[in-house]
Amino acid sequence: MSTGFLSPRQPWQGRRVVLGVTGSIAAYKAIAIARSLTSLGAAVDTVLTDGARQFVSAISFEGVTGRDSATELFSVDKSALHISLGVEADVVCVAPATADFIARSSQGRANDLLSTTLLATKAPIVICPAMNTNMYTHPQTQRNLKYLSENLSYTVAGPAKGALAYGESEGMGRMLEPDEIIEEIGKALVGSSPLKDKVVLVTAGPTQESIDPVRFISNRSSGRMGFSIAQAAHRLGASVRLVTGPVALPDPYGVDTIRVNSAHEMHVSVSEWLPQADVSIFGAAVSDYGFENIATNKMKRSEKKGPFILDLMENPDIALETKNERKAKSITVGFALETESLLGNARDKLERKQFDFIVANRADEEDAGFDSENNRVTLLFPDGRCEEVPLMSKHLVSEIIMGHILELLKDRP
């Protein structure tokens, strides 16, 4: 068994990010963006406009990044900061971007450090608008955004609909949340990928099999592994459809999420999307058994004498029964959760269900798997290879899984 594994690397790690902040009430969110990027391993250089400093201070960003914030076009030693920032950046993100800054950027204005940095860089640029609804929907703003996107190839991320500044009603113009902007930056850093515009289907979470209107049987799957995979696939440019059982996780940003309850509902949804999928990842912990006759009313203990017996029926094996519905030359990945004979049982599933590889892990590990942010897995391949992946976050495990999928895509047109 191989103990070497495909080294995971999230797109932000070791990269240089220039984070521009302009004068919007949403500027306070940029501090959280800078903190998260730094924790993900990025070197973050912040550039604050005069307007931004009316809302946030440079010292706040320096405190979370450990790096100086820039505000003036020229540094103390008279070096041209806009040149050095632009040349050294792997990505430039402006969050928030006001209507005024968007207008000046579309015209190629260069009257402050941030606008000149945009002109000096060859790195991808992400613009995150934040403004009043009327300002956002104004035809001139829409023309400016369209020009940035279509003519300059900037990524315009957002805005979203939500609460705006005090005294304003809810509307379109709210800046994306920090974690969503982090994903947009990650996507920009990835750039071109074999998964770009491919359709990826992911199943995640448990299923619930109803006994009566208030009771059900299920399992302890949190859905974190599947959600992390879906987000990683989206970051690589894929069109992702996530079919998930009941979990306490928000929909992953940019992912088409379909929520179901039972194994039957998941089966129906998978059958609908599978023929279109270039990559299918069966990560859900589907209940093996359900109930043929679900009580229409709550079962009461007072109405039953003696033992309470429930008749179980076998649920369909979704990955096996939809095998012939897979798109030609598509890639299929399975999961195997076991309490014994991990490799033997996983190998059996790999062969019976004709997966391109399978991700196996034990159900009885306290520091991994169920109810944990981490996982320890073994990847098994049809040619007999086994790859042990040591304990790491599920986000990093998802990067390893996607790395193997990218390798497989190289050999499939």
Q: What does each model-identified segment do?
A:
Residues 1-126, 132-337, 341-413:
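A cross-family phosphate/adenosyl-ligand binding-site feature
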